[in-house]
UniProtKB/Swiss-Prot annotation:
SUPFAM superfamilies documented for this protein: Thioesterase/thiol ester dehydrase-isomerase (SSF54637)
InterPro entries attached to this UniProt entry: FabA (IPR010083), FabA_FabZ (IPR013114), HotDog_dom_sf (IPR029069)
Pathway(s) of this molecule: Lipid metabolism; fatty acid biosynthesis
UniProt-recorded name of the protein: 3-hydroxydecanoyl-[acyl-carrier-protein] dehydratase
Gene: fabA
PANTHER family: 3-HYDROXYACYL-[ACYL-CARRIER-PROTEIN] DEHYDRATASE, 3-HYDROXYDECANOYL-[ACYL-CARRIER-PROTEIN] DEHYDRATASE
UniProt keywords, alphabetically: Cytoplasm, Fatty acid biosynthesis, Fatty acid metabolism, Isomerase, Lipid biosynthesis, Lipid metabolism, Lyase
EC number(s) recorded for this UniProt protein: 4.2.1.59, 5.3.3.14
Source species of the chain: Cronobacter sakazakii (strain ATCC BAA-894) (Enterobacter sakazakii)
Organismal lineage: Bacteria, Pseudomonadati, Pseudomonadota, Gammaproteobacteria, Enterobacterales
A GO term from the CC aspect: cytoplasm
Annotated catalysed reactions: a (3R)-hydroxyacyl-[ACP] = a (2E)-enoyl-[ACP] + H2O; (3R)-hydroxydecanoyl-[ACP] = (2E)-decenoyl-[ACP] + H2O; (2E)-decenoyl-[ACP] = (3Z)-decenoyl-[ACP]
Role according to the record: Necessary for the introduction of cis unsaturation into fatty acids. Catalyzes the dehydration of (3R)-3-hydroxydecanoyl-ACP to E-(2)-decenoyl-ACP and then its isomerization to Z-(3)-decenoyl-ACP. Can catalyze the dehydratase reaction for beta-hydroxyacyl-ACPs with saturated chain lengths up to 16:0, being most active on intermediate chain length.
Amino acid sequence: MVDKRESYTKEDLLASGRGELFGANGPQLPAPNMLMMDRVVKMTETGGNFDKGYVEAELDINPDMWFFGCHFIGDPVMPGCLGLDAMWQLVGFYLGWLGGEGKGRALGVGEVKFTGQVLPSAKKVTYRIHFKRVVNRRLVMGIADGEVLVDGKQIYTATDLKVGLFQDTSAF
């Protein structure tokens, strides 16, 4: 049985990356440097824009983060793909929180819009995931819309984020 808390600390997220949070068969978050959040501040089975589940997580920004040194030299900005990946990470994390088992894989996204950027001067990135549907049959899959905010201002939106959990990824 999964301990369905409403919030998770950085240590909890790191435990997920080691396969210790959702059991031996539960999905894992990536380890640092690809773990794109410091904490999950809210998880619910209802709520969100569609009343089918909601996740909110945060990433503290500091100018020494690895991506600022290489993307781009003289023009540091967090790659937009990392914000997108964070949203996929949270969809998979939610599926594990619901008790889903398997290895998480991003399956696609409907549309992504970038209307801002994360600079080294930012303080905090907030991710909000609004679930539209969870399929829990032979295939476990989450479908959600997401948004990324920097210091309270929305800068990315994504529709139809899809993540599946797979028992066997050898033919993926």
